[in-house]
Amino acid sequence: LFEIAGIENDIHSIIGDIRDLESLKKAFDVAQPEIVLHLAAQPIVRDSYKNPVYTYETNVMGTVNICECVRHSKTVKSFLNVTTDKVYLNKEWAWGYRENEELDGYDPYSNSKSCSELVTHSYINSFFNDLGISVSTARAGNVIGGGDFANDRIIPDCIRAAVKHEDIVVRNPFSTRPYQ
């Protein structure tokens, strides 16, 4: 999306694999960030069933790698881990969930993002509090960013349909989010 928006020359972007700790360390050394926004993920629920190992490597160990880089950074002051609204134990009740509800996730994607939050919480208590690094987590419904053209993602699917002047298909019109 950087190219489509015409901002690829205005934003410093490093493309890499979150599972590669050494590359992440180099990226942190180059960027020397003060604020880290962690949105990297294997975000496709259907793909998590096809390749759960890759999903956990990316979403859990990738978070460990980011946390390690934050922990060893001399410049980071604030860290945000963005997960998903799918982290909650689905109790099939009629009312919305609160942030302090029990974590779970029935499928590999949702569970891996719950694990990502647990990793972050462990790093807060084990390292970040003592280092004075402010840490937050956010549970997003839909996240979109540069290069996000994956199938089975509502926003990219709607954009593709609109560009082609096709009907926008709502796959499950009765679906609700756990906070609704």
Residue positions per predicted region:
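N-terminal Rossmann/SDR dinucleotide-binding element
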Residues: 1-35
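Catalytic cores of nucleotide-enabled group-transfer and carboxylate-activating enzymes in metabolic
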Residues: 11-18, 22-24, 93, 100, ...
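Conserved catalytic core of Hanks-type protein kinase domains
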Residues: 30, 39, 161-162
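Catalytic helix-loop patch of NAD(P)-dependent Rossmann-fold dehydrogenases
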Residues: 50-68, 72, 77-78, 87-143, ...
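Conserved acidic residues
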Residues: 34, 46, 77
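Substrate-binding strand-loop-helix patch
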Residues: 13, 19, 58, 145-152, ...
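Conserved NAD(P)H cofactor-binding loop of Rossmann-fold oxidoreductase domains
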Residues: 39-43, 83-85
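A short C-terminal helix-loop "cap" of Rossmann-like NAD(P)-dependent dehydrogenase/epimerase domains
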Residues: 7-9, 100-102, 127-134, 159-171
